[in-house]
């Protein structure tokens, strides 16, 4: 997927804006198509179709939009070392709260990124102020299957854009920005030349408390959390734990700590997304072979873990292997190389899709500590045997110059359709250095 440079905004046009947060702008039409002001390429600059002035949606509507995009924004931002609050605020600002034509179905382009995505694009007429005059151009904008892919692509732009002097947006990364304000300041003048761009994002983040989404990508060890565990039946084989979410928690981190799946936590708490909030109470149900009724309460000043007197203890990783994604890597290739499954890789790394990015750190193997649950040990053994068997029957090929899918299918005796399915290819295009399963 080619890196698309987000062009800087035209300062001349900003003199017309009365307020940094003028989300609903009067529209301009040109030959029946939406215009983009100046040399702008982001949806923040996309003029809406002619409508009467609109008032910002009521609180329940804005919160509904925030919740709908946060479900995609948080895991993407977390896995790429970005601030979820900043990414959500950008989506709000760039898409006029999801009301811009480009951000709505069937385009789902929240950030106005130009180019094509998996071969799909939509053309809008744009106007650029060049050499003292307005020039009209037809420009393609990427079309995504959903908001999730739009967030992933925006993260890709923020992480990989490089004009020869290092990553262009590196100062906006969480590793280099101590606060979200530092990240928005780093975007000002680069992602957008509007001098008020960072302030606009900060106001949105503050007004709608978007920092609640800024928990780290894995569970922390803060001393502010607490939980209560109770075995609800004398002869029950389960124990119910009430956990209080603290800063840094994610569903994935909690699931790893307590040895249960994210899906189980979502089901037990009727959660429709992976978004959780500081102070939220979560019911955690774990397997137990104890026949006694026991209860245990951990202090609010503890490390946020419980010590229920049952035979099952939270799963604690003993060791793990982490790799940095390089060109040609795929989840399938990594699963075969490290003798695991795609589902396990996605679970370890809290991924909602099969998309990974160059430079991204991924956990590719993880061994758990001892557990009193013999069932879990048996399952792990069975899984390992199954993975080893599957790996022995496959063949992984590194693409070299001159390779084609047809040639590889002839070499391996596998149909082209099978090779494409195994490697999640949407076209016949393959890249030098790419790893492909061919058998």
Swiss-Prot record:
Span of domain LysM: 241-284, 321-364, 395-438
Gene field: acmA
PROSITE patterns named in the record: LYSM
GO terms for biological process, alphabetical: cell wall organization; defense response to bacterium; division septum assembly; killing of cells of another organism
Record's comment describing the protein's domains: The LysM domains are thought to be involved in peptidoglycan binding.
Lineage, opening ranks: Bacteria, Bacillati, Bacillota, Bacilli, Lactobacillales
Cellular-component GO terms for this entry: extracellular region
Name of the molecule in the record: Probable N-acetylmuramidase
Keyword Phosphoprotein: no
Signal peptide: 1-57
The protein's role, per its UniProt record: Required for cell separation during growth.
Localization terms from the record: Secreted
Stretches the record annotates as Disordered: 218-241, 287-320, 372-393
Biased composition (Low complexity): 287-319
Pfam families: Glucosaminidase, LysM
